Structures are given as C-alpha cells and as structure tokens.
Swiss-Prot record:
One of its GO terms (molecular function) is rRNA (cytosine-N4-)-methyltransferase activity. Keywords: Cytoplasm, Methyltransferase, rRNA processing, S-adenosyl-L-methionine, Transferase. The lineage of its organism: Bacteria, Bacillati, Mycoplasmatota, Mycoplasmoidales, Mycoplasmoidaceae. This is Ribosomal RNA small subunit methyltransferase H. Its main location: cytoplasm. Coiled coil: none annotated. It comes from Malacoplasma penetrans (strain HF-2).
C-alpha cells in the first residue's frame, strides 16, 4: 500500500485505537473523524479490496487532503458532513449495518496548529473556531453578541468554570467600546480577571474558556450524543465502537449514551436472568503510553473506550 504524506501529523492513540476495532478484512468500517487520515490509513492497511471504509469530516482542508492522498483507494469514501448525520449519510450508500466505528473527539491538531482557524489561545488570529467553515456561527459572534447570562451559562456548562462572572463582566465591558476580534485579545481580557495563582498553573488559564466557546460554536456534545446513539443501533454483531475522548464532558456523554444499553432497568431483586446486547471491552492502557507521549504530547489527556455488540 502506498505511503501517505501526513505532514508530520501524528494521530492520537493510532495503534491502540485501530487494534481495538478488531478489524475483519472484508467488513465495513467508519472513521467518524478523518482529520489527516492517520487512523483511516491504518484501517485501510488491514482491509481487503472487499472491505469498505467511510470517513467523515466537516473541514474543507480535510476534504482537500483526502482528495490529494486517499482518492486512489477505491474502497474508501469521504463524506463531508458532521458525524451526527452518519446514519442519514450511510443510508445513501445502502449501509444499515457497520462493523466498527472510530471517534476521535475534539479539535484536530491541524486545526489547532493553523492560526487562521482561531482555535488556539497561543496563536493570534480572528476569533473563529468553526469546524465547518461554511456555518454562520463563530467564536466572534458568541463573544460579541451573546448576552451576559448566556456567556456565563456556556462557560459554566462547557468549561466547568466555577465562577466565570468576573471574566464575563470584563468581556461585556470591553466589547461595549469595540468588538473583540482576535484570540489573543480575548486571552488578555481573560487574564485581567484571572488570579495570578491560576495564571501560574501548568494548564493555560484560558484553556477552559476556549474549550467552552468551541463546544458552543460546533454543538459538540449534542453531536456526540446523536452519533453514538445511531452508531449503537447500526452496529453489527461483534462490531465495536472505539472512542477517544479528551475531557470529562466528552466522557460523560459517552457514559450516559452507553448507560441505557449496559444497565438493566429491571430491579436486581427480580429473579430474571438479564442478557445484554452490548459489553465494554477492557483495554489496557486506557491512557496513552509514555512512548506515545514523547511523540505526541496531545495524547496526554486522551481516554480510550471500547464497546462491543454481543447480541443482535
């Protein structure tokens, strides 16, 4: 198989994630977060010409990368849409059952590293954070047009910030004179109302604010919930869903979505032998290894989880 130019991008948990799919060479798989194709290429290496791989990504740059590097693979199909619409899109290919889904949640490294995309709190750019460059809502609209109450809500809910009020007050004060246009402009505003002690911590003080804005702009948690629910329903017997998550909110969505298929609604004291259609596959390590951390520090917060359908 031909090598793929990855532009030095290293996919998170590459071997662990693809190994966990337990790939059968003639089956159907879906990489729900194509990015720069690291996971997809590894999956394709394990498929025969009869096997099929469908990949999803909203990003225009990801589509260009696919066209330049993956169009040669006749059993690989790019779908430019949010993975929350996986069921509807796969139906267009007459696909109702899938043998494995891979989700690598959050923002991709190429998006973070491209200053023009406005995701990074370390690189100066216009506030954007859109995974889908064609949508209207961006970080600029959120920061400059949302009410005080709504900003407080998203920072508390999506950033898990205990008291975002001082920072929100500073945002409202600043934007009353001029729009907040760039990422570093926003970082400076956050800094003004962040205690020195927190500014000196290892994790960047603006990280959770940017996370909250990004989740709001891209409706990430609702997308995860719908996609996982549909993936569970479409999964073939012995098929697996592999998720790579990066923070507690993503992990909570995964746990809550799986809860209905893993927990019995029948009280324990009722003498009925419960059988479940799904089981969690225990993977070691759930966290990235030290060697992978040396190659890609962004794997530090990654968490791998695998669920398998055991009954139709």
């Amino acid at each position: 198989m031909n090598n793929i130019n990855s532009n030095k991008h290293i996919s998170v948990r590459l071997e662990d994630a693809v190994d966990s799919l337990n790939i059968q060479k003639d089956k159907i798989y879906v990489d729900c977060t194509f990015g720069r194709g690291g996971h997809s290429f590894e999956i394709l290496k394990r498929l025969s010409s009869k096997g099929k791989l469908f990949v999803f990504d909203l990003d225009l740059d990801a589509k260009k990368y696919f066209d330049n590097n993956f169009s040669k693979f006749k059993n690989c199909f790019f779908i430019q849409d949010n993975f929350k619409n996986l069921k509807e899109n796969l139906a267009k290919f007459d696909i109702s059952k899938v043998d494995g889904f891979l989700f690598d949640f959050g923002v991709s490294s190429p998006m973070l590293d491209n200053a023009n995309r406005g995701f990074s709190f370390k690189l100066d750019a216009r506030l954007d954070m859109r995974m889908n460059q064609n949508q209207e809502l961006s970080a600029y609209e959120v920061i400059n047009n949302y009410s005080k109450e709504k900003l407080i809500q998203i920072f508390w809910k999506y950033g898990e910030i205990r008291n975002p009020v001082p920072v929100v007050d500073e945002i409202i004060k600043y934007r009353s004179n001029k729009p907040i246009e760039t990422t570093l402009e926003l970082v400076d505003i956050i800094r003004k109302r962040t205690p020195i002690k927190i500014q000196r911590e290892k994790k960047h003080f603006a990280r959770t604010y940017f996370q909250a804005i990004r989740i709001e702009v891209n409706d990430e948690l609702n997308s995860i919930r719908k996609a996982l629910s549909d993936a569970l329903n479409m999964l073939s017997k012995n098929g697996r869903i592999v998720t790579i998550s990066f923070h507690s909110l993503e992990e909570k969505e995964i746990k809550n979505t799986y809860k209905d298929v893993l927990e019995s609604k029948i009280p324990k004291e009722v003498p009925i032998n419960n059988s479940f259609d799904f089981k969690i596959i225990k993977i070691k390590p759930k966290r990235a290894s030290s060697s992978e951390l040396e190659e890609n520090n962004r794997t530090r917060s990654s968490f791998l989880k695998v669920i398998e359908r055991v009954n139709e």
